[in-house]
């Protein structure tokens, strides 16, 4: 069975010419939404639909997409709230020091002394930098900023992340 990764959610239509507004969940919108790219649309309790990107542009905080064979609003209204995905095996190769989010979810985090802190539970993207949520056994989750100087090494193959915790980041009093 093929695994899929979310690249965006269709939140509304845009105009009358078959365009949709997408809240993107990908770090590579230029690649994912390029003309001719194939996306899968998943909707509740329906079989996935293959869509081929006809056009892509940015508008405010949205990616605006149109699809081959869907020239007007009536063709795409039914796709609202659908999730756009790509097959995991269609992902591009990354440089040696780069990784996809899904590759580090579940990785074990170690502090500068080599002590295990917990595992990466999720990744938040609130603004200037990503924040990794580290689930710690019998303690509150640790919100770890993904910035140089804090995350010192990411070993995707061995599922190990080394960090240098800034003073005051861990508050185990609560």
From Swiss-Prot:
Record-annotated PRC barrel domain positions: 96-169
NCBIfam families listed in its UniProt record: 16S_RimM
Gene Ontology CC terms, in alphabetical order: cytoplasm; ribosome
SUPFAM superfamilies from the UniProt entry: PRC-barrel domain, Translation proteins
Known function: An accessory protein needed during the final step in the assembly of 30S ribosomal subunit, possibly for assembly of the head region. Essential for efficient processing of 16S rRNA. May be needed both before and after RbfA during the maturation of 16S rRNA. It has affinity for free ribosomal 30S subunits but not for 70S ribosomes.
Family: Belongs to the RimM family.
Subunit-level organization: Binds ribosomal protein uS19.
GO biological process, one term: ribosomal small subunit biogenesis
Entry note about domains: The PRC barrel domain binds ribosomal protein uS19.
Location relative to the cell: Cytoplasm
GO molecular function: ribosome binding
Name listed for the protein in its UniProt record: Ribosome maturation factor RimM
Keyword Cytoplasm: yes
Gene name of this polypeptide: rimM
Keywords carried by this UniProt record: Chaperone, Cytoplasm, Ribosome biogenesis, rRNA processing
């Amino acid at each position: 069975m093929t695994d899929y990764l979310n690249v965006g959610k269709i939140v509304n239509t845009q105009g009358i010419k078959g365009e949709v507004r997408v809240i993107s969940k990908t770090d590579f919108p230029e690649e994912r939404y390029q003309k001719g790219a194939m996306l899968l649309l998943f909707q509740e309790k329906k079989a996935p639909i293959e869509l081929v990107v006809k056009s892509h542009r940015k508008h405010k905080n949205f990616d605006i997409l149109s699809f081959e064979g869907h020239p007007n609003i009536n063709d795409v209204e039914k796709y609202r709230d659908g999730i756009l995905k790509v097959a995991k095996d269609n992902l591009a190769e990354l440089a040696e020091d780069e990784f996809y989010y899904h590759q580090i979810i579940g990785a074990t985090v170690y502090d500068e002394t080599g002590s295990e802190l917990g595992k990466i539970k999720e990744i938040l993207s609130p603004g200037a930098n990503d924040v990794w949520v580290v689930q710690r056994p019998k303690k509150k989750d640790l919100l770890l900023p993904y910035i140089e100087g804090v995350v010192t090494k990411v070993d995707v193959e061995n599922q190990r992340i080394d960090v240098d915790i800034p003073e005051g980041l861990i508050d185990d009093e609560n």
